[in-house]
């Protein structure tokens, strides 16, 4: 686990700063062969729920940030989440590296759809 901001193997440190994400971070990113952007965060003690795993609000915040980052990659306009649906598959314990992948599936004049 890295609390120092040292990226895990294959990742680079974020070069952007946003108060909410800075509070959750440090965050990392990498690009896969298909140009897919992957964001990474380690689960820290302050991110835990009462059962010792990552709080659902943290997971949703990271997913939302990833979806927005994906939508803005090829746009010069800021984005805001209009609707968000999530399902949790399994707990993420302390020290886990959370990897978040998002892609834009459809773009309109004023809306982008991502998953």
Predicted features and spans:
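Terminal targeting signals and extreme-terminal segments of soluble enzymes
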Residues: 1-115
